Structure formats: structure tokens, C-alpha cells
Curated annotation (Swiss-Prot):
This is Phosphatidylserine decarboxylase proenzyme. Pfam families: PS_Dcarbxylase (PF02666). Is synthesized initially as an inactive proenzyme. Formation of the active enzyme involves a self-maturation process in which the active site pyruvoyl group is generated from an internal serine residue via an autocatalytic post-translational modification. Two non-identical subunits are generated from the proenzyme in this reaction, and the pyruvate is formed at the N-terminus of the alpha chain, which is derived from the carboxyl end of the proenzyme. Its cofactor is pyruvate. Binds 1 pyruvoyl group covalently per subunit. The active site is at S188. It catalyses: a 1,2-diacyl-sn-glycero-3-phospho-L-serine + H(+) = a 1,2-diacyl-sn-glycero-3-phosphoethanolamine + CO2. PANTHER family: ARCHAETIDYLSERINE DECARBOXYLASE PROENZYME-RELATED. The record marks G187, S188 as: Cleavage (non-hydrolytic). It is found in: Cell membrane. One of its GO terms (cellular component) is plasma membrane. One of its GO terms (biological process) is phosphatidylethanolamine biosynthetic process. The keyword Cell membrane applies.
Amino acid sequence: MKQYNDLFKIIHREGYIFIASFALVSFLLASFNEKLGCIGFIATAWCIYFFRNPDRFVPISDDLVISPADGIIQEIKEALPPPELGLGDVEMIRVSIFLNIFNVHVNRIPANGKILALHYNPGKFFNASLDKASIYNERQSVLMETDQGQKIVFVQIAGLIARRIVCDLEEGNEVKTGERYGIIRFGSRVDVYLPLKTALLVSKGQTAIGGETIIADFGRKKTAEFKFERK
């Protein structure tokens, strides 16, 4: 039984219906045409790969902000946070992470703390690599206060292909760094907003690994001092 549980654990539950559907269609196609069946099974294998849900070695420290998603750090700039969170006209540092269809799409909590507010905003589906995607695209915004008293924002943004955002958080949740909290299907973007003058540890063009890459350190510690926990 444990082996079956481990098997399901490595696939995000959002993928179950897709994988089952692809597999069923593949068997039907294979019964009529071998080549079509092969194409179907390749598509099924890709679907399993897309919804993979690997463990990560999460650096543990109350001062750290880690990447909530796999992808390329496409942009770092000063910008206003999503207006629906009621943070006013004070700019923050925005770190934008672009996920292509080959990245892990499971999202993770960036810091230890408490969820203060959530807001789902329906919108358009521009290419998530465009700057205007942060403003106009469908998004799920989350405001949290870290255990160090810092307010940070992280936003799941739907892209040109992604048409479903899943967020399992609720207001008032106490959360831990690296915990899984949602997923975006298929190809998307995640923005992280941090207070100005935050010490960033990433740069534009860098590859980020969700749950592992340290985006910022409020305490400016050296990496060698961090402890790591598998999640």
C-alpha cells in the first residue's frame, strides 16, 4: 500500500483526471491504429511528467524567502503590488518567475508566516512572459506576514496556455517555508513582492528551483549557516 501511496504522491492530484483521460484515449486509439496509439501514450507520458510533484530540500530559516516556483527569473523591478490586496501606492521589489511547460508547476510557500489575505482576480490570458501579464492576466494574489514581521506578496498568474489556477490556502493559515500550496496549468508565471531594500540573492536570467532557491534574506546570513529539510 505504501508503494501506491508514494506513487500518487509524486503526481499532483490535479493531474489525475488528465492522466486517466489521456491513457484511456490512448488505449482506444491503439485498438484502431498502432501509430496513433503510440502518439497517445507519448502524450500520456508527457502529462505525467508535467504534473510531477518532486520533493525538495528546503532551506530552513525565518529570515529567508525562497522561490515559490520553478522557472527563469525574468524580471526584477520596483512595482506596485496588486491593488486588490489594499497595500496602497507603496512600491515593492517584484521578482517575476516565468514557468514554461517543461517546468514543475507545483507552487510552494516562500516563507514562514501567516496568510493575511487572498484575492482571485479574473482577467485575460496574455503571454505570461510579458510585463503586462502581472496587471491584466487572471491571477491569485496572496498577502502574508512572515514570522519576522515582514509583509510579502506572492501571485499566481495564468498565461497564454494556463487556464486554471489552484490555490489551497485560506486566510489565517499558519504556513511554513516550502509547503506546497497550489499549481497552475499549463505554462504560467509567479510574482513575488518584497519590501524595498530587501537583500536579494538572485538576478535576472537565473534559473530558480521552487522550494530551494533563496530569493532574499532579511537577515543577510551566509548560505553555510542554513539548515535544510526535505519536503
